[in-house]
Amino acid sequence: MGISRDSRHKRRLTGGKHPYTCKKRKYELGRQPAMTKIGGKLVRTVRVRGGNLKSRALRLESGNFAWGSEAFTSKSRILNVVYNASNNELVRTNTFVKGCIIQIDATPFRQYYHNHYGIDIGKKKAGDEESKFSKRHAGKQEKRCQTRLPLDEGIKELFQSGRLYASIASRPGQSGRADGYLLEGKELEFYAKAMQKKKKAGKS
């Protein structure tokens, strides 16, 4: 049957082998990992136990990402994988799984911030003109600015580079989607330090 998710092959705590009392069972079967890469969308449907269907994403290029402090979600392009706590090989091959840290395009979030508050964050492209808002819209923006949470310094720097860090919260090999949330605050600091450590370890 191939891959099996049983525990009969495991040894005892003392190191002895368990006697085999039965063969592999259909309900214990496992499948090859999806190893989702960055590229044009390619999702396959897999029939699973009970006649249910799973979506196995083999390639994805974008996903929905939530900006927690602003309560805003947008579709954004996935650029590359930068950190994976479990396996460096998945970073090298740009393979993304649940919990890995990726870089995404900052443009949708920068546009939202500009439209919502009238404040431009991040780098400007050559030829970009100041968009003029109507008086009514400008008044709304002023009111929003009064209750606005101050922007985290770490995320401000990332907006300047045009790339944001995000964590994948969905399971691309099970749901066929790569959705997640932006890293900010203490979590962003933690992963920035972890990435620096891995870079230094790689150089030495």
From Swiss-Prot:
Biological processes per GO annotation: translation
GO function terms (MF aspect): structural constituent of ribosome
Cellular component GO terms, alphabetical: ribonucleoprotein complex; ribosome
Pfam families: Ribosomal_S8e
Keyword vocabulary terms for this entry: Ribonucleoprotein, Ribosomal protein
Domain of life: Eukaryota
Family: Belongs to the eukaryotic ribosomal protein eS8 family.
Protein's name according to its UniProt entry: Small ribosomal subunit protein eS8
Origin species: Griffithsia japonica (Red alga)
Lineage per the UniProt record: Eukaryota, Rhodophyta, Florideophyceae, Rhodymeniophycidae, Ceramiales
